[in-house]
Structures are given as structure tokens and as C-alpha cells.
Amino acid sequence: MQLRQVIIAYKAGDPTSKAAADDCAHCLESQGIHVMLGPSGARDNPFPVFLASATEPIDLAIVLGGDGTVLAAARHLSDAGIPLLTFNVGGHLGFLTQPRDFFQPEAELWDRLRNDQYAVEQRMMLAASLHEGGRENREPISETYYALNDMCVKPAAPDRMSVCILEMEVDGEIIDQYQGDGLIVSTPTGSTCYTAAAHGPIVHPGVDALAVTPICAMSLSSRPIVIPPRSVVSVWPLGTQDPTIKLWMDGVLATSIWPGQRVDIRMAEKPAQFLVLDSDRSFYRILREKLQWAGAVIHYNNNFRN
């Protein structure tokens, strides 16, 4: 990997993350590498400025923070093919980050990158767009929205807790009409987040699939479903004349869905690329440790396993 121009995004409002980002930027600049540095958070989005002001291809994005910081970076940078190197600095759960122990902004780290001493983990992204008219109308009326974890269609009203009726089609075929709090379309990466909280399936990130999970459906027969990755999920809001139904990308508001509109959700053309330094990184170990599965807190001796 060449290191000529590097993005450093840190968790907005977190002094630990900012201090680590400043140290990292100083180390890179001392090697003649052009650095673009900025905070990322609910009120800070540096990525459009980074992309617009780049004078040459961006080789790497270093993300210092928690999962929310990583999700924002993936949404904005994956379509440009910029790899992400993420560390849990100032974050909480850190499901999508490497431990801070691996963040040592010294010559050894940069030498590893230059010598390609890392693994590349590709994670599916989702793309969503709004459409009007019949299902045969494939021309979008909105920009394309991206998500690493999930796209969620659910209502949001300022003065009441709303339920909604959503019709879901897969590749033009009606699957169900859900009455409840909403619908989640998730990648395998996102299956351990909102989908898991809604009692949906946990899908290994090495599996190419989409998971569709209703949120608090009023019918006990409305169940989660796992579908092929090339499927197009179309969601139509029904039974309302107000634009209270919203599209959410990784928990961030994307847009309102007006009556008569539908949202099409599919696998994005380009995945997010994560650089992995931990040679012992294991999805199953992350499940045990981050989700506190019983294996992490209950220890029985298995004398049958060699």
C-alpha cells in the first residue's frame, strides 16, 4: 500500500480520540504524507469535504472512535473504494473496530501497511433509493443512500408513538404486509445490531445474504427471513396520508417516504473494505466477548475436546 494521502476521522467531542488523532497526524506528516483530519459525529460530517478537496487518490482512512464513527466513514467512503483502518479509541462496544492496543502510531505500523502486512475484510453495503409509480418504474426520484449495518423503514412523529403498515416485495413478488413498528433490512454485519435486538437472525459476515426483520409485528406469523444477496427489497407504506414514514440508514435519518412512494433496498455495488491487523481476529470470539454470550462468563471444562 502506498501512503500519500490519508484521512483521519475521530469521534467528535471525545478528547481521547482527538488526542490520538493529533498524534497520528503528526507522525504521518513527518513522513511527508498529506493528512486530512476532522471530527465525525451527529453534528459533524467531514467526509464530503475530504472527498471534494482531495488533490490525489485517498489511500487510506484511519477511523478513531467507536462503531458510530466507523458506520459514518463506511457510508461516505465505501463507494469511493477507500479502505478503512479502525481502532476503538473513545468508543464503547467496538464491534467494528480493532482494539486500541493495535493503534501504535509509530514506524512499525506504517511499515506494516506499506509492506501489505494486513488482511482485507470486505463487508457488504446496502444501497437504497426512492421511487414513484408502479413496480416497473426503476428510475429513482432521490439520491442513493448507503448503509453498512441496516436500512430501516419506520415511522417518526413528534407527538405520538406511531405504528405503520408496510408491504414488502422481493424481486417484484409480495411477501407480506407488516403492521407494527417498522421493518429492518440488514447486512450480515448489521445482523448483530438492531436486527439482533429485534430477535432477527445473526448472520456470519462471510455469508452473502440480506436479513429482513419486522419490528414488533402485530401478527405472530410475521417472521424474519434471510434472502439472497442480489435480491431487491421493495417496501411500500400503506394506510397513511402523512409523510411520517422515514428511511433510516444505520440509525441516521435518510429521508421521508411520502404516500405513493416506495423504497428499493439492495446490495451496493462496492463493499466496505476493512484492513485487519489482528491475525487472531475471530467473529465467534467477538460474539462471545462483545455480546457476552454464556461462553464468555460460564466456564465448564470440556474434557472431550482435545
Curated annotation (Swiss-Prot):
Single Gene Ontology BP annotation: NAD metabolic process
GO terms for cellular component: cytoplasm
Cofactor: a divalent metal cation
Pfam family, one: NAD_kinase_C
UniProt-annotated catalytic positions: D67
Class of the enzyme per the UniProt entry, highest EC level: transferase
UniProt record similarity statement: Belongs to the NAD kinase family.
Known role: Involved in the regulation of the intracellular balance of NAD and NADP, and is a key enzyme in the biosynthesis of NADP. Catalyzes specifically the phosphorylation on 2'-hydroxyl of the adenosine moiety of NAD to yield NADP.
The protein, known as: NAD kinase 1
Species of origin: Synechococcus sp. (strain ATCC 27144 / PCC 6301 / SAUG 1402/1)
